[in-house]
Design a protein with these regions (language model features):
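N-terminal auxiliary segments of SAM/dcSAM-dependent transferases
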Residues: 14-86
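A short SAM/SAH-binding and catalytic strip from SAM-dependent methyltransferases
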Residues: 236-250
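Class I SAM-dependent methyltransferase SAM/SAH-binding core
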Residues: 136-215
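Conserved Class I S-adenosyl-L-methionine
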Residues: 322-378
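Short alpha-helix
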Residues: 297-313
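A short glycine-rich, Lys/Arg-flanked "PGG" loop and its adjoining helix->strand segment in the class I
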Residues: 252-265
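Short, glycine-/aromatic-enriched active-site segment of Class I SAM-dependent methyltransferases
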Residues: 272-296
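Conserved alpha-helix/loop element of class I SAM-dependent methyltransferases that forms part
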Residues: 108-133, 150
Length: 378
């Protein structure tokens, strides 16, 4: 009904404007010196065409600006839901490990579970769920600080932390923690969170804004912190949780530095290329990786990944690569779809993450990309 009404109004307004202009121009006919002069038949035809185009433009504008009666009523009826959104909110961001259906798991819980899955594969938790060793952790890409809080705090710091916090005996803590992120905005946000943690307990935590993929670019302050942590620790680990495939020009300069200079173990959630990927799939993926800021050099098969770790110096028997793709891509795409629907009820949406939803759905459907947990011990 409303669409038809807007069409009629658009046409009426357009031709009304057309007639006003036409009458005005006719009034200028006697003035030959005027810029317009006598319109004539060609001029009248031009004015008619102009009117049609104006009507079409008005129709396009109104249809773009207006929704159906039902949709409009729904949005206006629920927009006050925005006023109930609680801030600050959890700021976890990785692909997550989805044990259950996406509708019964929050993103924060899935992100936490991906971290726990990596820690478990690395052997940090015994049957009682307690850490067996005192270690120094270098976290490459700590995001907005949620995983830092989870790894270093005995209890939730903010009220929003309680929504994803699990039993304390299932959480790992470390003696020394150094985090690196390239994102200055996230570094500032995470630093505020860590200051809140330090007020509660004297944790040995240092955060730096630097390019984790280029150890040669790290400043002296970062190098000094790492040296001090190494001296006061018996064991060293590097964590790259859903970050290493972004490292440019590739992840390997960093891993070589980790092995030779830091003499550290390596654990990560990373992406690999399926060994059965077709030429067409590889071509499409190559284009996508360029758009997502992930160098193509980082997309190797799991076997190639293992071989490269061996070339760096890790022993074959100390390398473990576990495929968890079925718990990552398809359920993440389903979650994003459901979240988009929920947010649209409030007149919002997931924005640019809609493109990511399509990509994750493709990965989950075809298996062209594999999500793996990588552990390499010295």
């Amino acid at each position: 009904m409303w669409a038809g009404l807007f069409v009629a109004c658009s046409v009426f307004v357009a031709f009304a404007i057309l007639n006003v202009i036409h009458v005005y121009m006719r009034g200028l006919d006697s003035y030959e010196s005027t810029l317009f002069g006598n319109l004539g038949m060609d001029g009248q035809r031009s004015m008619q065409i102009f009117g049609v185009w104006l009507a079409a433009a008005l129709y396009w504008i109104t249809t773009r600006a207006q929704r159906t009666e039902k949709e409009k009523a729904s949005i206006y009826g629920l927009q006050h839901g925005r006023l109930h959104l609680q801030l600050p909110t959890a700021m976890w961001m990785n692909m997550g490990y989805w044990r259950n259906t996406p509708t019964s798991t929050t993103l924060s819980e899935a992100c936490r579970d991906l971290l726990k899955a990596v820690l478990t594969e690395a052997g940090f938790l015994n049957d009682e769920g307690r850490i067996q060793r005192r270690i120094f952790l270098l976290d490459l890409g700590f995001g907005c600080g949620d995983q830092t809080i989870y790894l270093m705090s005995k209890e939730p710091i903010r009220a929003c932390d309680k929504d994803w916090w699990d039993e304390r005996d299932r959480c790992a803590t470390f003696d020394h923690y150094i985090g690196i992120t390239k994102d200055a905005v996230q570094a500032r946000y995470a630093s505020e969170r860590v200051e809140e943690l330090k007020q509660n307990e004297g944790s040995t935590i240092s955060l730096f804004c630097a390019d984790a993929s280029k150890p040669t670019s790290w400043n002296e302050g970062l190098h000094t912190s790492i040296r001090q942590a190494r001296v006061n620790s018996d064991e060293r680990w590097i964590l790259a949780l859903d970050t290493a495939y972004h490292f440019s020009p590739s992840r390997w300069p960093l891993i070589e530095h980790v092995h030779s200079e830091l003499e550290a173990n390596y654990m990560a959630f990373d992406l690999c290329l399926s060994p059965t990927a077709t030429w067409t799939q590889k071509t499409m993926l190559h284009l996508l990786t360029a758009l997502m800021g992930a160098p193509w050099a980082n997309f190797s098969t799991p076997q190639e990944y293992r071989s490269k770790l061996e070339q760096v110096g890790y022993m074959s028997e100390a390398i473990n690569i576990t495929d968890i793709s079925e718990h990552v891509f398809a359920p993440l795409a389903a979650f994003l779809k459901e979240q988009d629907s929920r947010l649209k009820m409030l007149g919002l949406g997931i924005g640019r993450f809609g493109v990511a939803k399509t990509m994750f759905s493709w990965w989950g459907r075809t298996g062209v990309v594999r999500g793996v947990i990588v552990v390499a011990k010295k």
